[in-house]
């Protein structure tokens, strides 16, 4: 008899606990995870570091330390890892908005783009229509016309691909530098490995 009651009570208890966890966002546990932030990025070259003449350079900018604003308030790892499945982390955008993203090379790219000047105007972005939706469609857009938060969305696996379709006409070996400017004055800088155009 006791074993039968136990078999009923344990699954019922687990079920009720899951209901509480799934609905936890509505009761304020997740109310402070509206925003996200990061302070470090890397440049990931998607094709090899040697670019053939018929190919475009393709790369990603990836956040290395994305943080959501309320994680410090939750002391229990079990609760934190469980409600993370349901809470919509960072849905309201960056806590400290971005004001500018600049991509440059350490070498002369062509006559219009000498070393350490912006290459933004020759970069095309393959981006989701809505980076916050998993089933969103991709499209191509000029770098300078894309909102900053779409370039670095709250989930880094949704980050777009960046294309430099033009070939350099000056130096053949380049290191890209990405500078990300925040509204609080912080600047995040990342540099790629050497890239060589054949």
Task: Pin down the residues of each PLM region.
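Non-catalytic macromolecular-recognition regions in eukaryotic signaling proteins
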Residues: 25-198
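Bacterial Sec-dependent N-terminal signal peptides
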Residues: 1-35
